[in-house]
Amino acid sequence: KSKIHLLSIIGEIEGHENLSGSTKTTKYEHILPELAKVEDTDEIEGILVLINTVGGDVSCGLALAEMLASLSKPTVSLVIGDSHSIGVPLAVSTDYSFIVPSGTMLVHPVRMSGMLIGTSKTYEYFEMIQDRILSFVSGHSRVSYDRLKELMHNTKMLSKDLGTVLVGENAVEEGLIDEIGGIQDALQKLYDMIERKR
């Protein structure tokens, strides 16, 4: 039997500051060294990523996605609830991705809290961050850069916001996720990929 490492990405992806104790979080500073160890050991042959996240910090979420994408071992992700916001790059960062029929993905423009300086440079900075996300997602899935940007700036779905919610099959049709499936499908796919790599 193959030895699989299980990684859960849940709640909110924590940034460079601790969130409140009542918030369920994924701490990137724990996961990055964990993934480095997984890459460096012969005992682990594949990684299964379970995702149910509302999103969170952009730079930390992208760091996790880049780390997953750069692993040499087979990786499979399974969206079992939500994969919102920066959860989208995480879901597509693996070699193959699944979403359960009721799972959702929310694609929306970059948001920032706190005090902002109202200059063109601030807008350009937002555009740069957004481009990093669009480039990563389109580079690791079947959706084009332009189509993803269109989904991100959709004004017809959310009453007080921009963006698109994709449920299950819609995420597959748009090319974000590879296939509809559950834990059995995800594990079987990972075992098959490991077997082909041996």
Please provide the spans of the model-predicted regions.
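N-terminal organellar transit peptides
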Residues: K1-V88, V92-R198
